[in-house]
Amino acid sequence: MAGGGGGGGRGEGEGRAATGKRERIAIRRIDNLAARQVTFSKRRRGLFKKAEELSILCDAEVGLVVFSATGKLFQFASTSMEQIIDRYNSHSKTLQRAEPSQLDLQGEDSSTCARLKEELAETSLRLRQMRGEELHRLNVEQLQELEKSLESGLGSVLKTKSKKILDEIDGLERKRMQLIEENLRLKEQLQVSRMSRMEEMQPGPDSEIVYEEGQSSESVTNASYPRPPPDNDYSSDTSLRLGLSLFSSK
């Protein structure tokens, strides 16, 4: 039987190793008193350890109070249990004072939300009817009112459209006049520039016409028409007189 028990133990171990899954413990009251006390001691230490880690890692103020089944007190406080309890009491009083106003605000918010939802539904239905949808719900009078509303809205649309078109036409006309004025101004500037250039090119009445290499008209005229040579008779008479005077002196 021992061998059979050993074989059964190995078989159970092999089955656990094969599955590789850890059995989940059902969360319920432990009937065995000794097992319950052992579990309480282990879980309490683990709970206090987690609370301490939370206070250190997250810089949180943690207070933990546990009573065993026999009424024994166990507690953990990251700072001071009295300080934590005082802080808890003051926070609870603040919450109690704020609860009525918060409830009122929640009631007001609920009523406002309901009213807004109703208005949104009515407006959405009105828009669909103006687009020609869901008209079967309306009677003759409601259809006539809808027709008047559409005609009035269409008139406003046409009026606004006409005004915008006229404004665009006026703007284009102003731009056209500006372009015409700018064109005339440029033409005048071009004409003035041409006149001034022509005046610069024409010589003045008292200025001498300059020909090649700085020669004036007078020098060019003299070069073109040389003066006649002196009279030969006059020069011969002068030579005779000079010869006679020289002969007499000898």
From Swiss-Prot:
Q: Show where the MADS-box domain sits.
A: 20-80
Q: Which PROSITE patterns match?
A: K_BOX (PS51297), MADS_BOX_1 (PS00350), MADS_BOX_2 (PS50066)
Q: Which UniProt keywords apply?
A: DNA-binding, Nucleus, Transcription, Transcription regulation
| Basic and acidic residues compositional bias, start-end | 11-20
GO CC, any one term: nucleus
Report the induction information: Induced by dark. Down-regulated by treatments with auxin and brassinosteroid.
List the biased-composition ranges (Gly residues).
1-10
Which InterPro entries does the entry mention?
Answer: MADS-box/MEF2_TF, MEF2-like_N, TF_Kbox, TF_MADSbox, TF_MADSbox_sf
Q: Which residues form the K-box domain?
A: 106-198
GO molecular function (one): DNA-binding transcription factor activity, RNA polymerase II-specific
Name the major location: nucleus
Tissue specificity, in the record's words, reads: Expressed in roots, shoots and developing panicles. Expressed in mature stems and leaves, flowering panicles, developing seeds, and mature seeds.
Which residues fall in a compositionally biased region of kind Polar residues? 214-224
The biological processes this protein is annotated with in GO are: brassinosteroid mediated signaling pathway; positive regulation of transcription by RNA polymerase II; regulation of transcription by RNA polymerase II
Q: Where is this region: Disordered?
A: 1-20, 196-250
User: Where in the cell?
Assistant: Nucleus
Per its UniProt record, what Gene3D superfamilies does this chain match?
Transcription factor, MADS-box
List other remarks: Plants silencing MADS47 exhibit shortened primary roots, elongated coleoptiles and enhanced lamina joint inclinations. Plants silencing MADS47 display hypersensitivity to exogenous brassinolide in terms of lamina joint inclination and coleoptile elongation.
Protein role: Transcription factor that modulates expressions of multiple genes involved in cell signaling and gene transcription. Plays a negative regulatory role in brassinosteroid signaling.
| Known partners and oligomeric status | May interact with MADS18.
Q: What is this protein called?
A: MADS-box transcription factor 47
Name the source organism: Oryza sativa subsp. japonica (Rice)
